[in-house]
């Protein structure tokens, strides 16, 4: 009986080692960065396509677009409201990076919304977005071969319940970045928000601006599904 129990224990131990080895091999196939440490996030990423320093290609589950995803970020998915998808025309996700800070752990958030919008009303949507967030509609605008991009950034803070906005980058580095990207060949649009809560230094503002603009420029809509 003891010999039988010992045999069973040896078999169990061997199986555990084998399973652990297989798991280790599977995990080693992924890049050693936070984005791939999360099993949900990695489902969207191409591990073989590091598109630039610090970014991997993210492919939407709608099949409508790809975007550069920062390797130090992970998608939030603790509840059904943090990642939302409706057929192939709407998707909303939020990703965060946790950094150590002398004030404690704080989060930087990146949120991306895919939806559809009438191109004829683009100026109305753009004004509503930027005026609603910053109290002014004066975004930068540029174009790529296939997209129109609007961008602005400012420092937002509250005094009591009243929100204040500082647009002057020399007075304070922005902590809120917003982008609006419209596909030239369809009615697809993407709105992006970046909440840079950890940014307390004016000289870091330019770095974050360049980082966010890289993400805006990286968006590629799926032209096979385009329809106006």
Predicted regions and their residues:
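N-terminal targeting sequences that direct proteins away from the cytosol to non-cytosolic compartments
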Residues: 2-93, 194-228
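Short, exposed beta-strand/loop patches in secreted or surface proteins that constitute
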Residues: 47-49, 57-58, 74, 82-84, ...
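Ser/Thr- (and often Asn-) enriched beta-sheet segments in non-cytosolic proteins
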Residues: 57-59, 66-68, 74, 111-115, ...
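Second-shell loop/turn segments in exported
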Residues: 59, 111-117, 163-168, 198-206
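Short, solvent-exposed coil/turn segments at beta-strand boundaries
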Residues: 68-74, 102-104, 150-153, 181-189, ...
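A short acidic-to-branched-hydrophobic micro-motif
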Residues: 91-127
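Solvent-exposed, acidic/flexible segments
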Residues: 119-123, 171-174, 201-212
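Signature of long, low-cysteine stretches enriched in small and polar/charged residues
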Residues: 124-185
């Amino acid at each position: 009986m003891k010999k039988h129990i010992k045999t069973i224990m040896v078999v169990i131990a061997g199986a555990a080692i084998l399973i652990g080895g297989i798991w280790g091999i599977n995990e080693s196939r992924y890049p050693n960065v936070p984005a791939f440490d999360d099993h949900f996030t990695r489902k969207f990423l191409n591990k073989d396509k590091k598109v630039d320093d610090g970014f991997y290609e993210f492919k939407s589950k709608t099949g409508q677009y790809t975007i550069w995803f920062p390797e130090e970020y992970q998608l939030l998915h603790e509840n059904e409201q943090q990642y939302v998808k409706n057929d192939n025309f709407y998707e909303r996700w939020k990703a965060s990076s946790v950094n150590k800070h002398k004030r404690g752990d704080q989060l930087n958030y990146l949120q991306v919304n895919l939806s559809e919008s009438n191109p004829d009303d683009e100026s109305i949507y753009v004004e509503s977005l930027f005026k609603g967030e910053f109290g002014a509609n004066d975004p930068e605008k540029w174009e790529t071969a296939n997209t129109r991009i609007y961008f602005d950034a400012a420092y937002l803070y509250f005094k009591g319940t009243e929100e204040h906005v500082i647009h002057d980058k020399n007075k304070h580095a922005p902590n809120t970045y917003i982008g609006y990207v419209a596909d030239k060949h369809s009615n697809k649009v993407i709105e992006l928000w970046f909440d840079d809560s950890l940014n307390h230094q004016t000289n870091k503002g330019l770095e974050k601006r360049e980082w966010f603009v890289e993400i805006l420029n990286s968006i590629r809509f799926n032209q096979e599904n385009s329809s106006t």
